[in-house]
Amino acid sequence: MSNKEKGANVERELYQIFIDNNWRAVRVAGSGMMENTACDLIAGKKGKKFCIEVKSSKKPYKYISKKQIEEFIIFSQIIGLKPILAVRFNREGWFFIKPEKLEDPGKNFSISLEQARKKGKRFSQAFS
């Protein structure tokens, strides 16, 4: 399975979690493939609207380019949504973290499983 297919699968998984919890969500067409599509999902519920960048990792950490995060934040601001990263670590489930809480070790931003446990939230905490 290609990285593109894996990414689409985790996006669909998260989309379904939103639907199962009475939120409305849409996957952004061309996410990760085209310019100006700097997020993967848009989700909302009365008075709450989020722009979501979806990441997954088999390893206990994930690196994300600074350019991608900067574009994601700008995109979120332009359309008036709160930016949040959704990171799924295999066998650990989903963590939701604000972009400003990412670690900045240099070239890329990073989030480790340990940091996600400390700084991130689970679905019910992030979207209550």
Regions inferred by a protein language model and the residue ranges of each:
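Amphipathic alpha-helical interface surfaces
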Residues: 14, 37, 68-71
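Acidic-basic catalytic patches of nuclease active cores, encompassing PD-(D/E)XK
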Residues: 1-30
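Acidic-residue sensor for enzyme active/binding pockets
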Residues: 11, 53, 68
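Active-site metal-binding core of divalent-cation-utilizing nuclease and nuclease-like domains
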Residues: 21-46
